[in-house]
């Protein structure tokens, strides 16, 4: 074995260090060292010839890997292997900073399971009856938030394990957007001077603009929670407060969320510096909330209205609204603010039902106005000219009225959403999310929605601490139990629609309660109060007007309009009456 190794080494010097010969040399040297170690360990006391061979091997030792390959290598990989394979003890982190193999395997298996659910569309049977990829990604983002960040009942830093899991998992889900591109024309110059127009790929404009902004908002919210590591306030479970209080049964009423923790402040209240910091953090969170709501409203507005939603609409606006709302919207003295003041909006169901009715009436009126105009154009040209003018004038007047009514309903819906920013998604929004096929828009909508929920929760928690500080300073020497009872009482009044302080206007959000048939993913249902909230949203974008970020309704699409084909004098008259 010794001679073979020396011959091999000299041969490698003679014929050059090619890759194949180097690999063969390394294998032969490794085998020779292994065989020599095994033979020396099996024999007891070696002979003189054995000692001389060992001495010769020590003099002419084989070259190291670093000498052969030309770069430094670790010493651990060149050591002689013993006869018995030593089982490595699993360590959490080795000397090189790598995690143990078991942890990597579990993470890989988790990613495999998540990608399998996305590809199968949440249909584990594999029969192809799952949801579309857009809805599957939206469901995955929503469920990930609910599992990791959905229970923010305290102002405290997020555990490092949850933080790493959130960032790793959300990056995996958002990585799909890296492959969503759009083709743009560009010119390519050749050496001979010719210029040819080619199509280049670039990231889609909405993802390129909004997704980095959402990532930045995500990091800001996590940094806000990390800033509450050392605070002057603390939290106490309501069960402990009830056991210590002599009036333990005074607040145990139906609907009281006794399982939620209550904030506590010192008897003399928070310091001025802490108070200013909380006020600044509240305003900063408010701006983040507005940005998330704006991106979410734009993403929803750009989604197409499902045909199933349009087919389920009633035939006229009175059937959608009811007699009371219909009379107020169609009256000459219409005022959205006065109408909202005259309606009982003390319950969440009443507000959601009103929003659904008003939103449906918008589409009914606009669809009827457009359909009447097309019917008048599709009639035969053999009709007398006078009848054509009369019908066109009559339908033009009816269409203008319906368009005015639709604009009034839209303004009423905007005022309603501004008054209740935590309003749950309407039937149209839910239908858009369910039937949306655009993966990019689905990512923007779901990511902005969960960040909006997180910002809202942080704002509510800050308001709770500030409210407890106000109570402690007003009461002076009042005990903590009375402060806790007041906070519970005002929280219950806020949930039932009471009015008063800022804490009443922001009730704890209940994020996920609506689900679709065929999928297990819930959707946002933020709670609200009937009073005007402190978080006023950005101006909402109408899904009908077009404008910036808006889309045309399906019944206004160009493929359904035949007037482009030309109707002679009838088309000229229609264009004149429009202008």
From Swiss-Prot:
InterPro entries with a match to the protein in the record: PRONE_dom, RopGEF
Keyword field contains Transit peptide: no
Keyword annotations from UniProtKB, A to Z: Guanine-nucleotide releasing factor
PROSITE patterns: PRONE (PS51334)
Gene3D superfamilies: PRONE domain, subdomain 1
Ranges where the PRONE domain occurs: 98-479
Compositional bias ranges of the Low complexity kind: 31-61
GO molecular function: guanyl-nucleotide exchange factor activity
Region Disordered, annotated ranges: 31-89
Function according to Swiss-Prot or TrEMBL: Guanine-nucleotide exchange factor (GEF) that acts as an activator of Rop (Rho of plants) GTPases by promoting the exchange of GDP for GTP.
Domain free text: The PRONE (plant-specific Rop nucleotide exchanger) domain is responsible for the GEF activity.
Alphabetical list of PANTHER family matching this protein: ROP GUANINE NUCLEOTIDE EXCHANGE FACTOR 1, ROP GUANINE NUCLEOTIDE EXCHANGE FACTOR 6
Entry protein name: Rop guanine nucleotide exchange factor 6
Lineage: Eukaryota, Viridiplantae, Streptophyta, Embryophyta, Tracheophyta
